[in-house]
């Protein structure tokens, strides 16, 4: 009689505050690494004395083990506490684990210790939990809430910009002071916190600063200048991210600024019409580039600097701000949640980007973002 092949155990060692796979598995927030083991359908957590009682109340698991008990077993009569990886290997040996599947970011020293104990370690390529790619109705609901938090930040930014007035040198003034990127970012982040979110790297980039897509922005903001507002907070309760970008201008736009902004808006509208399960994302990306070039905005090198549309069209969104897939590198699938964020960047005119979040469907896509697009404030 042939023996039944035992499936490898699924193993994560990470802090769920910063590791999406661990948070997805356990629904439990913790700032320090702990052990997750799934074997034969049973989920076990190894937690510190500090966290185990809270874990029993909050975490999605079948069994809870105290790390300190395992540590004492390994330490024996030694006066020195054993390294974490020794305790991990001991725990797996006690459970009879011979083979494991781990995330791609599994710590090397842990993998080496397990290998030394004849425990096979195989890293995944892509999602550790494949089901993370197609979002459930509950996840879509949670991400919609994260977008409402995002919109609270954008709303505050627009309110302040509308109240600001141009001063000397066209510097915007608000509340008796020169309005800076730092001040506006602080106001956006405060609104996010009040709405139940965690700010993460909010971008307020005016003028040519906006031509570097990940420049956070610094210094005074000016009238009649394009300002990129890219807001991507995390819901403090669920861990899911929102992500939206609007490009605005306080004052009057020049013909060149308006053309840039309108072209980006048209590029995003084109993408939204083409998104559908089964479509090659690269065809969408190329269609946007072609539209931009036809309207006089080629992507090229000028004086050693990239101009035009030189980043991706969008990315997956969920428990990570950037997760698989990259829109332009895959065939789209039903229930993927993606950002759609074309942009154009030309020093001297400025940068413009519009970003919304969609759910891919078999018939097209559903837009989850609600915040309006308005150039002049």
List where the protein language model places each region:
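Active-site neighborhoods and metal-handling regions in enzymes and metal-associated proteins
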Residues: 1-377
